[in-house]
Amino acid sequence: MQFIRNDKLYDTDTAKLIETEYKYFYQPKSYVDKETHHSLYKKSNGEFFLIKEEYERIQRGLYPISKPTIEPLTEEEAKKWAEDNLSTTKYINTFGPISE
């Protein structure tokens, strides 16, 4: 997938996928549940971006609710997302050593 934001190209085929967070939302009294996928990517120039996808989950599978969206992130925003979603090892491999 390719996106342009603020006159910059973001391409999921050339960027490195760091992690995808999956969330499932059960909807009582509904035949359709919801699932979200948030994927953190790092470009070769060090920029980060988050791809957000939403799906309806029914008995026969997942169906997109809308087009995927992109959110360019600063390194600090990417670190905050990573603190909540990455293992310690993956965090250090992505951002480098941290102090104790």
Task: Annotate each PLM feature.
Residues M1-E100:
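Secondary-structure transition motif
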